[in-house]
Amino acid sequence: HDHSHHDHGDHSGYGTGRERIEVLEDIFAENDHCAAHNRDAFDAHNVQAINVMSSPGSGKTTVLQHVLAAAQAAGIRTGVIEGDIETSLDADRLGGYGAQISLLNTGNGFGGECHLDAPMVAVALSRLDLSALDLVFIENVGNLVCPAEFEVGEHRKLMVYAVTEGEDKPLKYPVMF
């Protein structure tokens, strides 16, 4: 390449005329640090944690009812961190399966978030007796966009998908899939 370019304009393709700003700080750094502490707490008590995610109404709570019943029958000690924007309806549904339940209403003191993040899960963990548990399910707020991007300290992610949601969802929400 032996010639110079005199056009130093924005060639980003956005055509906004606005200046592009380079972000030098990981916006998830604080969350990820807290997620690592949550994972350390689970690991210190030999507890496996599963982050359960899906769209609203796709069946997370129903799946958990069946899993908790089977776990109780098998003698597996379970806990649930139940994330919901406003109500305790799902937490109430899960209350009869021998699991410790810690409810997080994201609309109550957490700004109405559409997902759980690691600091919220840390609050919920403080309400559980991890020494009395083998397995914790983190039922995230129903949403296909935000929950997939936030680590909360889980060992595994589980996505519940209802076929009635349409075959285009993996294309529209690739981070979740």
What are these regions (language model features)?
Residues 143-156, 160-177:
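Conserved C-terminal guanine-recognition region of P-loop GTPase G domains, centered on the G4
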Residues 1-15:
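Long, basic/Gly/Ser/Thr-rich N-terminal segments
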Residues 14-40, 44-53, 58, 62, ...:
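Nucleotide-state-sensitive switch-loop elements of NTP-binding domains
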